[in-house]
Amino acid sequence: MNRFDRDVLNQSGARYLIVFEGVNDIGGVSDANAPTLTTNLINAYTTFAGTAKARGMRAYGATITPFGGNGYYTSARETVRQSVNNWFRTNTIYDGVIDFDAAVRDPVTLTNFQAAFFPGVNANDWLHLNPAGYKAMADAIDLNLFTP
């Protein structure tokens, strides 16, 4: 929230917003505070969309990618990710959703990346994909979302 004005709203000519945030927030929360974080993230995402749309921008939400295997993975944090992703997929605040989670997750172990996208650029962190994974994310974006 702190950088939203500078990084988004104050950019001249910006017409579109893709909100792809959250995994670092999730990793930093205690399991006890995870339910509160879900609410806080959804409130922030709602503010982002409303503010951007009030400025005439189109706003798209992007699901949070898996982080199973990372040192800060817990089932409580995974519940936050799944709850936020479900909200993105079903909300009516955004103009659309870009499902990065579906594009890169393993079809059997839904908490992890597909094996083809690992190791990532930061070796074994289970957060950063390799180039094939980032290409899958790019391919998940429907470019028709950006036609006037």
Language-model features, listed with the residues they occupy:
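Conserved SGNH/GDSL esterase-like catalytic core that processes O-acyl groups on lipids
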Residues: 1-46, 68-73, 128
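Arginine residue identity/basic-tract feature
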Residues: 3-6, 15, 55-58, 77, ...
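Loop/turn elements at helix/coil->beta-strand transitions in domains of secreted/extracellular proteins
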Residues: 12-17, 53-60, 92-96
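Catalytic His-Asp segment of secreted/periplasmic serine-dependent ester chemistry enzymes
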Residues: 27-29, 64-148
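C-terminal structural cap/anchor segments
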Residues: 38-69, 73-81
